[in-house]
Amino acid sequence: MAEAPVDLSTGDNLEQKILQVLSDDGGPVKIGQLVKKCQVPKKTLNQVLYRLKKEDRVSSPEPATWSIGGAASGDGAPAIPENSSAQPSLDERILRFLEANGPHRALHIAKALGMTTAKEVNPLLYSMRNKHLLSYDGQTWKIYHSRQEGQDIAHSGVTQESPAIICQHNPVNMICQQGANSHISIANSNAIQIGHGNVIVREKACGEPGPRTSHPLPLAWDASAQDMPPVAHGAQYIYMDKSLLQQVQLGHHNEMSLVGDAGKHPSYSFSDSPPEVSTTTADPGASFNMQTFEPGPHPEGDTVQTVHIKSCFLEDATIGNGNKMTIHLRSKGEVMESGDSEEPKKEDTGTSSEATPPRSCQHTPSDSMLPTSELRAMALGDSSPQTTEPVLREHEVQDIESSQDTGLSKQ
């Protein structure tokens, strides 16, 4: 008996017919046979077949040959099984796949879903990470919550709140990162310490009473607490894109001393033409890896702090371990003392481990102009226990050229 023609007014009818034909044959079916049995043009049939393949409902073991159900990917990554009684969402299918097979790369997940490239599944994976369903270590994806928690969140359709943005309300912010998957966003801040054992000291300006204030970051290991078990710091992954960083310490055991109040600088907008700041002229982005060398036991090995900087404006920043920066501000129009050259100087990093007393404590004027493509008073690198600490001084002067004072020190 001849097959009844398929109503092409709806795609569902054609999908059901294709699945029925493939299921009845029980094996691979040539595209020519499908065209005859479904009685539709080959072009229309192929469009539906490839859509079903992307949904992992059919597979193509050979060219122009189709069979029911998904197939294992060619690189050994297992396929996500199809549940014919229900149609789970892509989120749920990814959760099931990762729970059954463990952490996998994005490409393996994409192929298990019937896709061909990692780019097709990456938006979904990052969306699931923002919902705290998945975690990513830079190589592989894995489940963040337990299976039941992941199912509840995926079925509820409720999106978890994004991590709160921390806005500065105090002279110095101290942020302690806890947990393996904690996420911190910082906006509109300066005088920030990112790392362990850092110290920022803000000295009073000339004529202002009162002692200087120190804001050390709490140490995770205290030798006096003998009854406390040693705990190693967790690895830190820091990404900065189109940001303005002033008086920022990235690394461990850095010291920064500020004499007088920080000058008011014009606000920068990164929406139109962000300044490209880099350690090299060829690459607009830079990455740094830093190892801790702090005292105390480290049961899990040395801690790595990975920092990636792209299109940022950095002023008075230290990147590395054991750096020391002292900043003296000079106001516009100030007369240079005898013996000073007309251009700002960078001190020899090996001549002294103590900060030179400030020659002036006047504030930097609010209309001082800053370059948008330079690193200013920035220390890069690590300081070994045997070497002296570097001292960098910044002098604000009258014009733009003399204000472009960049200090780079690597020991």
UniProtKB/Swiss-Prot annotation:
Modification comment: Ubiquitinated; polyubiquitinated following influenza A virus (IAV) infection. Phosphorylated.
Record entry for activity regulation: ZBP1-dependent necroptosis is normally inhibited by RIPK1: RIPK1 inhibits the ZBP1-induced activation of RIPK3 via FADD-mediated recruitment of CASP8, which cleaves RIPK1 and limits TNF-induced necroptosis.
Keywords on record: Antiviral defense, Apoptosis, Cytoplasm, DNA-binding, Host-virus interaction, Immunity, Innate immunity, Isopeptide bond, Necrosis, Nucleus, Repeat, RNA-binding, Ubl conjugation
Gene Ontology cellular-component annotations: cytoplasm; cytosol; nucleus
InterPro entries per record: RHIM, WH-like_DNA-bd_sf, WH_DNA-bd_sf, Z_dom, ZBP1
Annotated crosslink Glycyl lysine isopeptide (Lys-Gly) (interchain with G-Cter in ubiquitin) location: K17, K43
Transmembrane segments: none
Subcellular compartments: Cytoplasm; Nucleus
Motif annotated as RIP homotypic interaction motif (RHIM) 2, chain positions: 237-261
Z-binding domain: residues covered: 8-70, 84-148
Annotated region (Disordered), positions in chain: 60-86, 263-303, 332-411
Disruption phenotype: Mice are resistant to necroptosis, characterized by a decrease in epithelial cell death and an increase in virus replication. At a modestly lethal dose of influenza A virus (IAV), mice display significantly increased rates of mortality, probably caused by a failure to eliminate infected cells and limit virus spread in pulmonary tissue. Perinatal lethality observed in Ripk1 knockout mice is rescued in knockout mice lacking both Ripk1 and Zbp1. Skin inflammation observed in Ripk1(mRHIM) mutant mice is abrogated in Ripk1(mRHIM) mutant mice that also lack Zbp1.
Motif (RIP homotypic interaction motif (RHIM) 1): 188-205
UniProt cross-references to SMART domains, sorted A to Z: Zalpha
Pfam families per the UniProt record, alphabetical: RHIM, z-alpha
Nucleus as UniProt keyword: yes
BP term (GO), one: apoptotic process
Domain note: The Z-binding domains recognize and bind left-handed double-stranded Z-RNA structures, but not A-RNA, the right-handed double-stranded RNAs that are structurally very different from Z-RNAs. The second Z-binding domain (also named Zalpha2) acts as a molecular switch regulating pyroptosis, necroptosis and apoptosis (PANoptosis). The second Z-binding domain is essential for sensing influenza A virus (IAV) Z-RNAs.
Function comment: Key innate sensor that recognizes and binds Z-RNA structures, which are produced by a number of viruses, such as herpesvirus, orthomyxovirus or flavivirus, and triggers different forms of cell death. ZBP1 acts as an essential mediator of pyroptosis, necroptosis and apoptosis (PANoptosis), an integral part of host defense against pathogens, by activating RIPK3, caspase-8 (CASP8), and the NLRP3 inflammasome.
Subunit (UniProt): Homodimer. Interacts (via RIP homotypic interaction motif) with RIPK3; leading to RIPK3 activation and necroptosis; interaction is enhanced by CASP6. Interacts (via RIP homotypic interaction motif) with RIPK1. Component of the AIM2 PANoptosome complex, a multiprotein complex that drives inflammatory cell death (PANoptosis). (Microbial infection) Interacts (via RIP homotypic interaction motif) with murid herpesvirus protein RIR1 (via RIP homotypic interaction motif); leading to inhibition of ZBP1-dependent necroptosis.
Name used for this protein in its record: Z-DNA-binding protein 1
Organism expressing this protein natively: Mus musculus (Mouse)
